[in-house]
Amino acid sequence: MSITQTNLDNILPLVARGKVRDIYEVDEKTLLFVATDRISAYDVIMENGIPQKGQLLTQLSEFWFEFLKPYIKTHLIEVDDIFAHLPKVLSEDRYKSQLQGGSLLVRKYKLVPLEVIVRGYITGSAWKVYKKSGTVHGVKAAEGLQESQEFPTPIFTPSTKAEQGEHDENISVEQAEAIVGKELADKIGKVAVELYSKAKGYAAGRGIIIADTKFEFGLDDDNELVLVDEVLTPDSSRFWNAKTYEVGKGQDSYDKQFLRDWLTSNGLAGKEGVSMTEDIATRSRVKYVEAYEALTGKKWE
């Protein structure tokens, strides 16, 4: 059984319902991020979900928030004991079953209006653009790169943060500077590449290549960067199997590429009202579990 939408009967105000997360306000300084089992591809949410996906995303985000805590402030307050911070009624089974294991209690910060993407390898949309123009996000890239090849150094490639139902738009660093200012854009790019590099090095030791990832940042009262949202999950990243990695082709991945491929091959990419087959949902869940277990070293129960 999958949870594709939460319902807390207005005990907490619903702030937003995103592609995956339902966000509730606990108080003026605190939010509850509930990762549901919804899954989207090509900016469309599937009609059915993937069992335990929300819990897998949440537990993996918690792992990475702890891993990156020495390097940056994060918005995470609590995962395991959220009910101590919530109205007592939410401990009742009908609510607890929706929240347990899939919720992050987080501090509220002013959001930076950018999707902060770091690419270590050329793949996906970056590869498509490079083949046509030899550029990545408007910047001239090295000549002769092959699909899935590692960049000499990771690159910061921002995009706009679109509203629900709209498409994120890849932009240049100069366009990002126009949105948030040069000083903040420079800082974000530097910090994001550093965080990616720390995670990439760790993952390599676990047999996983982090090809690229998306970070989101907030600002605290002192205008210092804070890592927010989810972090380094199969929804926000491309994870590849290092054992089967081979330059010059697409890679075995532990992310939504499996679903994207199925939609494309069936002529369903970008169409509303699509339900995954049980087989696709099950096989997608296996990918999420494999990523969790490989990266954390823990068995998923």
Swiss-Prot record:
Involved pathway(s): Purine metabolism; IMP biosynthesis via de novo pathway; 5-amino-1-(5-phospho-D-ribosyl)imidazole-4-carboxamide from 5-amino-1-(5-phospho-D-ribosyl)imidazole-4-carboxylate: step 1/2
Family, similarity comment: Belongs to the SAICAR synthetase family.
Protein name: Phosphoribosylaminoimidazole-succinocarboxamide synthase
EC number: 6.3.2.6
This protein's UniProt keywords: ATP-binding, Ligase, Nucleotide-binding, Purine biosynthesis
Alphabetical GO biological process terms: 'de novo' IMP biosynthetic process
UniProt-listed PROSITE patterns: SAICAR_SYNTHETASE_1, SAICAR_SYNTHETASE_2
Keyword Ligase carried by entry: yes
Gene label: ADE1
An example molecular function term from Gene Ontology annotations: phosphoribosylaminoimidazolesuccinocarboxamide synthase activity
Keyword Ligase: yes
Catalytic activity of the protein: 5-amino-1-(5-phospho-D-ribosyl)imidazole-4-carboxylate + L-aspartate + ATP = (2S)-2-[5-amino-1-(5-phospho-beta-D-ribosyl)imidazole-4-carboxamido]succinate + ADP + phosphate + 2 H(+)
InterPro entries found in the cross-reference section: SAICAR_synt/ADE2_N, SAICAR_synth, SAICAR_synthetase_CS
Broad EC category: ligase
GO cellular component: cytoplasm
